[in-house]
Regions:
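Single-stranded RNA-binding regions, centering on S1/OB-family and related RNA-binding modules
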Residues: 585-805
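A glycine-rich phosphate-binding loop feature that marks nucleotide/adenosyl-phosphate handling sites
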Residues: 199-206, 363-367, 421-422, 446-453, ...
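C-terminal accessory/binding modules appended to enzymatic or scaffolding proteins
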Residues: 19, 24, 353-357, 365, ...
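Accessory alpha-helical DNA-binding modules that contact the DNA backbone or grooves
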Residues: 42-43, 54, 58-166, 384, ...
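Long, charged amphipathic helices and adjacent flexible linkers at domain junctions
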Residues: 325-333, 338-343, 495-526, 631-679
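Duplex nucleic acid-engaging cores and interfaces of nucleic-acid transaction enzymes
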Residues: 45, 61-64, 71, 75-362, ...
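Long, charge-rich intrinsically disordered scaffolds of nucleic-acid metabolism proteins
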Residues: 95-96, 108-112, 444, 450, ...
Length: 805
């Protein structure tokens, strides 16, 4: 039975449904994206080469459309199933059909379907089988004024007519108990009541945590031992990491976790009387709503039974179900936010500035067994390896001579040192050796994150079957400096460790997002067809792992590719794959100059006609010759404004790399460990991870420091990613060092403001400026500051809760 009718919704289309969730996406582009995707086009291809059809939608919008269509289809499929099931039962009214057909929210759909779901043998089902539904209907109707009891008629008297030994109803009390079970089910399955309860929890509910049975001392969850926060606040992506922290504490049994209304103040005791126990106002409000729904005639003799049913329906059925839904909603928002943070950080790392195709010497640091040294040539090919010892004076001297000789003879242009254990020590030795030998070769610290995973992987074994793990690691470190993207695609992005709570989120959703990011980065940069590994080629639009291996195998047998067109000779490389992939592949050795640009072969004909009209070779349109292309109104009309602009950009700088120019970076040479740090010390650093609560910065002491969000700038910062990104070079000031916890608090604020946290300002005011990076100047304090006091905002508050980095 339905207490009231929900308003019938207007017919909803996919476009209007998606536009409500993503108002920034223009409706006309949605159909084009879905049509192209249905034809087998990839997201990078649609974003790069079909801008005229989509209105230049970016990859984020295109993925939102494709993912949204999948969600829409699942909702429509569920609608169809529910309608069919209820119709099969002969209970589908026109009103119910309209409500189901007009509902595009899965929880609400399930609310409407709940009364008609096939049920297990519940107490209500047993009561119906015992013939007690008429008694339940009489109680309900009397309680709502639909029926007036006969003079002297009572619930007990009415119930006595239903006594039956055969049906196991021994007395009136048993009959009434069965009727109440039916009413409990009726109330708990009512869509309107469930919707109202859900809304109250989402709008006014609080997530609450208290100290759990297995709480440790000290505990990283101490801030949550007596904590509550509005569900509405935690549903905002920028705050959702706090819910993940609460959930992790609950899973580790250091916290209890529940939902409810705001905790009221403890009533004051008066004249020796014990204060009343505070009640949950949200629970009281919901109970009043359920009791009113169960009985509108308080003078009816059966009113207490109906109110009892209301209490039980609310507390035993509806609240647990709704709390699960709210937790699920909070988890989904938190998962999406954490995955987005991780994906953005991975993107920044993958697009780090490359040192370029130059010979590099890689150093995998080690104390006991020595540093493994590997040399790679300008193409990244492994040349040879050796060991450098750091511990003994004799070992250092001999290793130093050997190192200097390697650099001279190998034409080494840079030394890449892993930033793991003994990394700073190795860096110092290498610098001293090169300086003493008069060699002006940059020494660069390179992140080892994920290098050990690669070294032990099947990929590394296939690539270097006869080499030791540590030598593989040194090779990877050298190659990471040459081309971070080409080397990092060999590593599972999850092992790079640049997220927040990534081990707590859905593995499937995380992997899907990271795969999309890697694909996006590879296609954004482009791939040299003649040097790329099969792992890199696999991420090119339309290719995939199998075809990537076929390309490398063909290249090994036939030699380098001389044209994009020759790709069609590779087995299984179809015309459709060519369409999707060709524009992202570069061939420096090609006879056709456009084969080393991002211009798609489908546009060659237009440019060749233009060159013919101008009386110049096609190469004459590149570089300075692009001015004649810019002047061609006919070509602009033929290609469309978006494609024309992209073609001009490619012709201006053929084979351009969208990544920033590499600039060497050095740590302070007088600090190597936490013990070397002093309060107020200013240090250069590299941002290694950005989370919702701040940024982690490597200052060269084997332990990243935290710049809390309140210490990122003199201005209010809502999102740390507005200020910094992984790989950015920054200048930071040491605020606090906790040797016992191996924690460092840092600040990027000016000296006068570094010790005071400022509150939020009106939205849009004092927005921080642009981003830093390898190719840009450092950000943060540049002059020695006054001695700071302990910051008002505890910079370790979030650090203590972070795991899975």
């Amino acid at each position: 039975m339905v207490l009231s009718s929900l308003p019938a919704m207007a017919q909803v289309t996919f476009e209007s449904w998606l536009a409500a969730a993503h108002p920034e996406i223009p409706v006309p582009g949605m159909a084009a994206v879905l049509r192209l995707a249905g034809e087998g086009a990839t997201v990078p291809f649609i974003a790069r080469y079909r801008k005229e059809q989509t209105g230049a939608l970016d990859e984020v919008a295109i993925r939102a459309i494709i993912d949204g269509k999948e969600n829409w289809d699942s909702i429509c499929k569920r609608q169809t199933f529910i309608l069919g099931e209820i119709e099969r039962q002969g209970k589908l009214t026109d009103e119910l059909r309209a409500r189901i057909s007009g509902t595009y929210d899965l929880p609400l759909l399930e609310d409407l379907y709940l009364p008609y779901k096939q049920k297990r043998k519940t107490k209500a089902v047993i009561a119906r089988e015992a013939g007690l539904e008429p008694l339940a209907n009489w109680l309900w109707d009397c309680g709502h004024g639909l029926v007036t009891p006969a003079p002297g008629e009572t619930p007990d008297g009415r119930a006595s007519a239903f006594i039956s030994e055969e049906k196991k109803v021994p007395d009136a009390d048993a009959a009434l108990a069965g009727a109440v079970e039916i009413i409990i089910e009726r109330l708990s399955e009512n869509a309107d009541l469930r919707t109202a309860t859900r809304s109250r929890y989402m709008d006014d509910g609080f997530t609450k945590t208290t100290k759990g049975e297995k709480a440790k001392s000290p505990s990283k969850f101490e801030n949550y031992f007596a904590y509550e926060e509005r569900v509405q606040v935690l549903m905002k992506p920028e705050n959702s990491h706090r819910y993940l922290a609460m959930r992790r504490g609950w899973m580790e049994e250091e916290l209890t976790l529940h939902l409810g209304g705001p905790t009221p103040r403890e009533p004051a005791e008066a004249e020796g009387k014990r204060a009343a126990v505070p009640v949950d106002p949200l629970a009281e409000e919901l109970l009043a709503m359920f009791e009113a729904a169960a009985c509108s005639k308080p003078d009816f003799a059966g009113a207490p039974l109906l109110k009892k049913a209301a209490r039980f329906a609310l507390r035993a059925h509806v609240v647990p179900a709704i709390e699960n839904e709210v937790h699920k909603a909070l988890r989904e928002v938190a998962d999406e936010a954490a995955i987005r943070v991780f994906a953005e950080n991975v993107r920044k790392l993958l697009l780090s500035a490359p040192f370029g195709p130059k010979a590099v010497l890689g150093v995998d640091p080690g104390l006991r067994t020595g540093c493994k040294i590997a040399v790679v040539d300008d193409s990244g090919k492994y040349v040879g390896s050796t060991v450098m010892h750091l511990e003994s004076a004799g070992g250092k001297a001999g290793s130093g001579n050997m190192l200097a000789e390697l650099v001279r003879k190998g034409g080494i242009r840079a030394v890449a040192v892993g930033n793991g254990t003994a990394g700073r020590e190795a860096e110092t030795v290498v610098r001293d050796v090169l300086t003493a030998a008069g060699l002006n070769v940059p020494v660069v610290m390179v992140s080892e994150a994920g290098a050990s995973v690669y070294s032990a992987s099947d990929v590394a074994r296939d690539e270097f079957p006869d080499l030791d793990l540590t030598v593989r690691g040194a090779i990877s470190i050298a190659r990471r400096l040459q081309d971070p993207l080409a080397e990092l695609v060999k590593v599972d992005p999850k092992s790079i460790g640049v997220g927040q709570y990534q081990h707590d989120v859905s593995p499937t959703a995380l992997q899907k997002s990271l795969d999309a990011v890697v694909d996006s980065c590879v296609n954004q940069v482009g791939v040299n067809l003649n040097t790329a590994s099969h792992l890199l080629l696999a991420h090119v639009s339309g290719i995939g792992p199998g075809l990537a291996k076929a390309i490398v195998e063909y290249r090994g047998k036939k030699g380098i590719f001389r044209s994009r067109q020759s790709l069609l000779e590779v087995p299984r490389f179809s015309a459709k794959v060519f369409e999707q992939a060709a524009g992202f592949l570069r061939i420096p050795e090609a006879a056709h100059p456009l084969d080393n640009t991002g211009v798609h072969p489908e546009r060659y004909g237009s440019l060749e006609k233009l060159a013919e009209r101008l009386g110049v070779p096609i190469a004459g349109l590149l570089g300075a010759g692009v001015q004649s292309v810019k002047a061609s109104r006919e070509l602009q009309q033929e290609l469309g404004a978006f494609t024309f602009a992209d073609v001009v950009k490619e012709l201006e700088k053929p084979g351009r790399d969208p990544r920033e120019t590499f600039v060497p970076f050095s740590y302070r040479q007088d600090i190597h460990t936490l013990q070397d740090l002093e309060l107020g010390m200013v240090c250069p650093g590299i941002v290694t991870n950005v989370t919702n609560f701040g940024a982690f910065v490597d200052i060269g002491v084997h332990q990243d420091g935290l710049v809390h969000i309140s210490q990122l700038a003199d201005k209010f910062v809502k999102d740390p990613r507005e200020v910094v990104s992984p790989g950015d070079r920054v200048s930071v000031r040491v605020l606090e060092v906790k040797l016992d916890k191996q924690q460092i608090a840092l600040s990027m604020r000016s000296g006068s403001n570094a010790d005071v946290a400022r509150g939020p300002r009106p939205s849009g005011q004092d927005r921080p400026g642009g981003q830093g990076g390898y190719g840009k100047g450092p950000r943060g304090p540049s002059a020695p500051p006054p001695q700071p006091s302990r910051p008002f905002n505890n910079p370790f508050a979030s650090l203590d809760k972070l795991r899975g980095r």
